[in-house]
Amino acid sequence: MIKVLIVDDEPLARENLRILLQGQDDIEIVGECANAVEAIGAVHKLRPDVLFLDIQMPRISGLEIVGMLDPEHRPYIVFLTAFDEYAIKAFEEHAFDYLLKPIEEKRLEKTLHRLRQERSKQDVSLLPENQQALKFIPCTGHSRIYLLQMDDVAFVSSRMSGVYVTSSEGKEGFTELTLRTLESRTPLLRCHRQFLVNMAHLQEIRLEDNGQAELILRNGLTVPVSRRYLKSLKEAIGL
């Protein structure tokens, strides 16, 4: 089965696409969203294979949503748009495909056929992974999306419910990015299997008898350090 998530702020547009997709035996619609906050949360929770994403939405566009998703776990993106084919060329590098509104059944069939072919090759995504260093981390919290500058990030932690970013002020937000992505694309250092820390916020390292340690940050918060990563942290501060 191909798991599909529909994101469009227009209820009628979502309904029309839903009706077309429900006629496909191998398609499972796992959810529908009307805005960016709902969409990012649903992608993390539902892990769809394909995201049918409207480009023009209030406040945060479909293009911006794509940039907030973790490249390592990003689904196939099929943009939905009322733009003509000349404008669409600007979007092709970001998407697996696009569909013009109103969506034609024959055109949708072509998209689904291509998706089936790609899945049979076990390709995870057609989107190129951007390996440039991140200047900020996209976070969600309290029904909003905000960009936390790297200088303001104190540490990042991974839990059963996802990955969370803690700011220098102690405020916490959820991010779609994985620890692995953040470790490779930010200055954050691994100090524990479930933690990354911004060494610029470090005040002291408190050593323990069992060979482990604890980081004390300038905001008073503490971060655990496992024996495996203690040596690299000491080297990072010149010890």
Curated annotation (Swiss-Prot):
Entry keyword annotation includes Amino-acid biosynthesis: no
SUPFAM superfamilies (alphabetical): CheY-like
Keywords, ordered alphabetically: DNA-binding, Phosphoprotein, Transcription, Transcription regulation, Two-component regulatory system
Post-translational modification: Phosphorylated by BtsS.
Gene3D superfamilies: 3.40.50.2300, LytTr DNA-binding domain (2.40.50.1020)
Sequence ranges assigned to domain HTH LytTR-type in this UniProt record: 137-239
4-aspartylphosphate, modified sites: 54
CDD domains referenced in this protein's UniProt entry, alphabetically: REC_LytTR_AlgR-like
Domain Response regulatory: 3-116
Domain of life: Bacteria
InterPro entries hit by this protein: CheY-like_superfamily (IPR011006), LytR-like (IPR046947), LytTR_DNA-bd_dom (IPR007492), Sig_transdc_resp-reg_receiver (IPR001789)
Listed GO MF terms: DNA binding; phosphorelay response regulator activity
Role: Member of the two-component regulatory system BtsS/BtsR. BtsR regulates expression of btsT by binding to its promoter region.
Protein name stated in the entry: Transcriptional regulatory protein BtsR
